[in-house]
């Protein structure tokens, strides 16, 4: 299946163009907190059958970081369908490079995992996707890894979810494409060739308080504080975020907060100025940037009035929590955060 380049260019997508600030973490080597012992008897990658590949992914408990689903389950559903395999190394949020960094640093393992996944699917059609708009990158993005082509995804943030929606709309036939994470491919190679289970995850440790930003391969359950100690703090952060700066969550309990499979980044940030929120001025910027075409402030106003039905009619369930509305708001209102709180109340059976 050939995908049109218009899907990847993203010329007409809504959203916000963000300064990526991925350096210097992206160009540095991936730090392993607990280096693995070398495998004495690696299996021949070319001799593995599709069923053996799936069994290895199953026994290693590999979870795809793109959607949190077991990799074996995703591959088995599309097995033998000739599906085009798309590898997610997009990382379109600032600071975060926990997919692109390992893909580049461990490219032989990543390429090996992609070939294994493609064999399980019964396809030779595979492509790695990276974000186009990384102006500060100090590392050259190659045209391919191990012969597998790399395509650049353009467009404003959130480029990835908008690309997925366009793919789903244009190529709606079952088995036409499958999106898997670059890190899941690394773990698939290790599981199938070396017999290693997934006990680690890749995390970007960065922010303006981090002395040595880099991507770290951390054991699951590692306290967040240990990651910050490893990379060093130059000053006391005013907030620590787990995940990207737009979609992540703030934490204060650094000793008891543990690294999970869903932890893409630990960002230590110091804000030197206090932000105050003001009354909505009705500028309409939140509506202009919303990738779903919603009117976020109007939805929030209806929720504040307790008008659940009006909020539903305005499309509250279509909100993807990309937080573009909060980012662009000149009044500094936490539009996306408030909408999320109301949605959680509504799911719990409470009225807004």
Segment roles from a protein language model:
Residues 1-125, 132-133, 144-148, 157, ...:
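Iron-sulfur-cluster electron-transfer modules
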Residues 47-51, 55, 60-66, 122-224, ...:
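Hydrophobic alpha-helical positions that pack around
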Residues 82-84, 200-203, 263-264:
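Short glycine-rich loop/turn motifs
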Residues 95-98, 213, 228, 250:
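Short helix/loop capping segments that flank catalytic or ligand/cofactor-binding pockets
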Residues 135-143, 250-258, 330:
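Short glycine/threonine-rich loop-to-helix capping motif typified by GTGT followed
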């Amino acid at each position: 299946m050939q995908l049109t380049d218009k899907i990847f260019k993203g010329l007409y997508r809504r959203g916000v163009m963000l300064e990526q600030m991925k350096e210097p973490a992206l160009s540095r080597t991936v730090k392993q907190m607990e280096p693995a012992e070398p495998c004495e008897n690696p299996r021949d990658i070319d001799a593995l059958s599709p069923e053996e590949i799936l069994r290895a992914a199953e026994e290693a408990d590999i979870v795809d970081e793109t959607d949190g689903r077991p990799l074996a389950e995703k591959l088995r559903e599309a097995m033998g369908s000739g599906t085009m395999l798309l590898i997610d190394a997009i990382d379109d949020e600032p600071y975060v490079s926990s997919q692109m960094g390992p893909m580049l640093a461990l490219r032989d393992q990543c390429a090996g995992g992609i070939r294994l996944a493609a064999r399980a699917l019964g396809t030779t059609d595979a492509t790695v996707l990276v974000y186009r708009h990384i102006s500060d990158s100090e590392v050259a993005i190659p045209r391919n890894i191990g012969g597998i082509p790399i395509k650049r995804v353009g467009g404003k943030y959130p480029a990835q979810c908008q690309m997925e929606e366009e793919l789903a709309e244009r190529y709606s036939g079952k088995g036409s494409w499958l999106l898997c994470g670059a890190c899941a491919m690394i773990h698939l190679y290790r599981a199938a060739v070396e017999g290693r289970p997934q006990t680690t995850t890749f995390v970007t440790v960065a922010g303006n308080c981090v002395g040595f930003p880099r991507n770290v391969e951390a054991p699951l359950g590692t306290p967040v504080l240990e990651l910050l100690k490893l990379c060093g703090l130059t000053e006391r952060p005013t907030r620590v975020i787990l995940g990207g700066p737009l979609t992540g969550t703030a934490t204060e309990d650094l000793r008891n907060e543990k690294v999970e499979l869903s932890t893409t980044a630990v960002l230590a940030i110091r804000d030197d100025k206090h932000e105050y929120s003001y009354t909505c001025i009705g500028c309409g910027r939140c509506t202009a940037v919303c990738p779903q075409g919603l009117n976020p402030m109007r939805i929030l106003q209806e929720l504040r009035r307790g008008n659940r039905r009006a909020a539903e009619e305005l499309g509250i369930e279509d909100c993807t929590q990309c937080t573009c509305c909060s980012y662009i708001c000149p009044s500094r209102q936490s539009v996306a955060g408030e909408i999320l709180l109301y949605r959680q109340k509504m799911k719990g059976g409470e009225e807004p």
